Amino acid sequence: MNKERKGRFNDVISSLEEAKGEVEDILNEEQDSYDSLPDGLQMSSRGEKMQDYICLMEDCISKIDEVVGFVEEKIIKKK
């Protein structure tokens, strides 16, 4: 792969990091919302759904990190 095409992956990483930041913002908002619920509502189906989404967003962030690491290690740094 030539340097120009390989260099474009830096833009891909920037886009992924930006998306990760957005997901983190949404995650933090949802976590704050969940934390402000009374204990009884946290244990309700609504609270459980919120927890499910929080877990999914944490997984999403982890997957983005995996992709960024893969691109950096296997594509950008490969000679």
Q: Where are the language model's segments positioned?
A:
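Long, low-complexity or tandemly repetitive, helically biased scaffold regions used
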Residues: 1-79
